Amino acid sequence: MIAKPEREQIIALINREVVPAIGCTEPIAVALCVAKATETLGKRPERIKALLSANILKNAMGVGIPGTGMIGLPIAIALGALIGKSEYQLEVLKDSTPDAVAEGKKLIDSQAISIGLKENIEEKLYIEIICEADGDTATAIIACGHTNFIYVALNNQVLLNKQTTSTCNEDAKEPELNLRKVYDFATTTPLDEIRFILETKRLNKAAAERSFKGNYGHELGKILKSSKSEEQILGSNTFTHILSYTSAACDARMAGAMIPVMSNSGSGNQGITATLPVVVYAEDNHKSEEELIRALTLSHLTAIYIKQSLGRLSALCGCVVAATGSSCGITYLMGGTYEQITFAVQNMIANLTGMICDGAKPSCALKLSSGVSTAVFSAILAMEHKCVSSVEGIIDNDVDRSIRNLTRIGSQGMNETDKLVLDIMTHKQCD
């Protein structure tokens, strides 16, 4: 068993990274930054300027904003100024009302909001908000983490300044993880210390079940659950249940439903993907509560571990990371050993590496379905002691080095892809 001080560090890490969120976390983080700047200003802004990194722009362009029936940044910014409370963190817009949305539309129509690309920055997650009213100016900056404020100022008075060249590398207190340590923590930690992970099941399963009753996004989850043609082709089984629950929760979230989900590493979709395949497999196969708790812990902590070297935002679709976690959790529930769990990870990396992120949007449900179906395939292969070998592609004999290969491709190798994707998104013709 891992020593208690290190266990406490890892538990604190999970509690930082697995948190509730309403709506896509990129526009919500922008709304949070607006809320902080507005609170600092102390009055309703007359003008709001947003300067954002390319990845924030990409992830906020086509996604629904909770409770508004609208997509994109302008309404998120307007509501952040009108009703946002920074203390709510990633639930900053939970007090939104129809009246607030109507007022937000007026603010947008008044041309009070401007949005631009922040040039000459290294951070992939960067949000700078400048609010002005009655000659006063308030500035708030979030960088590197969706709730990580690094600068707050009112006029010439600096209230917070963590702007340094190592802003994104200030995680010295984070525990050093590898896959073996992740596995040991998940499988040996006293149960009462990690029971809190069950909250991921409660929130994310509720989101899926709410989605089944509504009409959200492309309705992939609902169709997979109830379509006769789907049942004739795929049947009704644990595999199709995993696909329908995971995609349904994503359908609702990307469409802007006012439904909280438990996120992972700043992403609600990653939280959904790390949770629901594991929950559905456990329930369909009558696994014990302890087995579910340990499998969910393994899934979420694996995703956190991979994101440590990948970064918050990248050109790589986050479902690759989160589905790798759920594949580990499913393999564990199947009775897999640590070796078989490493096989599942290797199989995932061999399959899904390179799937691009082209922003948060309703069609993310399709990518999540691809990710979790691959998670199931990888677990099945692993249980048969089948693993992609190190003579194939980017796979290394050492699973942690394979993970580094994945994250190097996502964080370094796909930078030009990221730029091209954003260029296409900002210049394409839309209906």
From Swiss-Prot:
Molecular function GO labels: L-cysteine desulfhydrase activity
BP GO annotations: L-cysteine catabolic process to pyruvate
UniProt xrefs under InterPro entries: Ser_deHydtase-like_asu (IPR005130), UPF0597 (IPR021144)
Pfam families: SDH_alpha
Family to which the UniProt record says this protein belongs: Belongs to the UPF0597 family.
Record's protein name: UPF0597 protein BVU_2091
